[in-house]
Amino acid sequence: MRKIFRNIHLWLSIPFGILITLICFSGAALVFEKEVMELCHRDLYFVKKVEAAPLPMEQLMTKVAATLPDSVSVTGVNVSSDPERAYQVTLSKPRRASMYVDQYTGEVTGKYERAPFFNFMFRMHRWLLDSMKQDGGIFWGKMIVGTSTLMFVFVLISGVFVWWPRTRKALKNSLKIVANKGWRRFWYDLHVAGGMYTLVFLLAMALTGLTWSFQWYRTGFYKTFGVEVQPSMGHGNAAANATAKGGKPDGKPEGREGHGERSGNRGERPAGEGGRPEGRGAHRRSPYIHWEQVYEQLAQANPGYKQISVSDGSASVAFNRFGNQRATDRYKFNPRNGEITEATLYKDLENSGKIRGWIYSVHVGSWGGMLTRILTFIAALIGASLPLTGYYLWIRKKIKRKPVGLRSEPVSS
């Protein structure tokens, strides 16, 4: 039986190993995208000086709208509980576009743009740099990533059976990484012990990641948790359309798929072009006039909030909680007077409204805060190294088994 698992482990690793390395390494690079971006562009994400009180939200939104072309409008604002963080203002287009404004001075600090490096890593992680076919053809990059990830699951499981020690002493020795007995011993220990230490994290990342690759897998995965899904429309859809009886899945703002993304409501266009009041000119009230009223109501009712997002007619509250990092309480309000008319709390949602956020949180390691993110980062790096160390050990073994007479001899001059 061990020989069977050894063959499975070997012959799946040889063709898919390098792809697994690329997927794991690019995934590791995305874990701390937000922190790296904020460190490199602090002036964009943080205010220069915290004042006694921010400017009225209506004034801030009007300032941002004045900088936009006529074809783009303000659709919402995300307010952090951290007074040093600038307000994030979401825009109607392009997709997931946003700008940042200093809430104390009204200065627009800039527009969010994903760094080319992280965009490259994201496309590598999801599609091996392939692009969706406009004619509806096969999305090869997505399929190859999904197939490689599925094979990785079998490689990991078979590796456990190959590794499984026969005695307690062997178990203890097999979980040590020895660095002073030669390179071959070091790479062997890193491959074996590193794989076992990161097994749970790697399996969790692989099993959740497959939900983005295959509809059949996503359907089965969701059914395991008692959730029915509708077939995804088109290629590259990042998540399934869960049939949520208790509101939209996860209760999260829309437009937050993938690694390292920023939140942002995509509410209806509040007014005419550029987010400016249209129709009867000055006689029409600003579409943003009640946003601050809604924000203040929600902030007072939820003192432990992480972020409050407000758009035209809807709002959401996110918290610093263990578990699903996309869990939000969602609200609807009357845009004419700011009265909250409906509340959908995350705790009241059925599984169909929570599973997508849980899948994402487990996949990127954010479910347990900074600790699990660090562990996920380390696990992904080790996962990227496993095929490389495996290739090294396999080649060394092949060379060692080669008959002496067939090995290349140095040519004497």
Functional labels for PLM-detected ranges:
Residues M1-S413:
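Conserved histidines in hydrophobic membrane contexts and catalytic metal-binding motifs
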